[in-house]
Amino acid sequence: MIVGIGVDVVDIERFGRQLERTPGLRDRLFVPAERELNTRSLAARFAAKEAVAKVLGAPAGMNWQDCWIGLDHNGPTVQVKGTVLAVAEAKGVKRWHLSISHDGGIATATVLAEG
């Protein structure tokens, strides 16, 4: 059963400027393993996190570091803990599906939550 679908797009150049202007933003939005990635990859991961938030109804108090984007042999994966895991479990999410892409200066992500 599909619990929800979320989609988000991020302008890569604009996102890069935001990271430069706001020194703590990278640390607030990303786990240590993500922080060293290039701006294009960070924008795609942020789009994925936003898509996860949309699936969950953009819960108040969501900690951005409680959701991170990993990689396995099949591609990108959604990983959750803490605040995000609690809301996902309450909504019955058992499995995440994620597609991310970046082209033409835009990063996009689509997340499907399955229960």
Curated annotation (Swiss-Prot):
Biological process according to GO: fatty acid biosynthetic process
Catalysed reaction, written as an equation: apo-[ACP] + CoA = holo-[ACP] + adenosine 3',5'-bisphosphate + H(+)
UniProt key word Mitochondrion: no
Record carries keyword Cytoplasm: yes
Domain of life, per lineage: Bacteria
Its EC number(s): 2.7.8.7
Keywords for this protein: Cytoplasm, Fatty acid biosynthesis, Fatty acid metabolism, Lipid biosynthesis, Lipid metabolism, Magnesium, Metal-binding, Transferase
Molecular-function GO terms, alphabetical: holo-[acyl-carrier-protein] synthase activity; magnesium ion binding
Cofactor(s) for this UniProt protein: Mg(2+)
Subcellular location: Cytoplasm
GO CC, alphabetical: cytoplasm
Residues noted as binding Mg(2+) in the record, renumbered to the chain: D8, E50
Family: Belongs to the P-Pant transferase superfamily. AcpS family.
Free-text function comment from the UniProt entry: Transfers the 4'-phosphopantetheine moiety from coenzyme A to a Ser of acyl-carrier-protein.
Full protein name: Holo-[acyl-carrier-protein] synthase
Organism: Pseudarthrobacter chlorophenolicus (strain ATCC 700700 / DSM 12829 / CIP 107037 / JCM 12360 / KCTC 9906 / NCIMB 13794 / A6) (Arthrobacter chlorophenolicus)
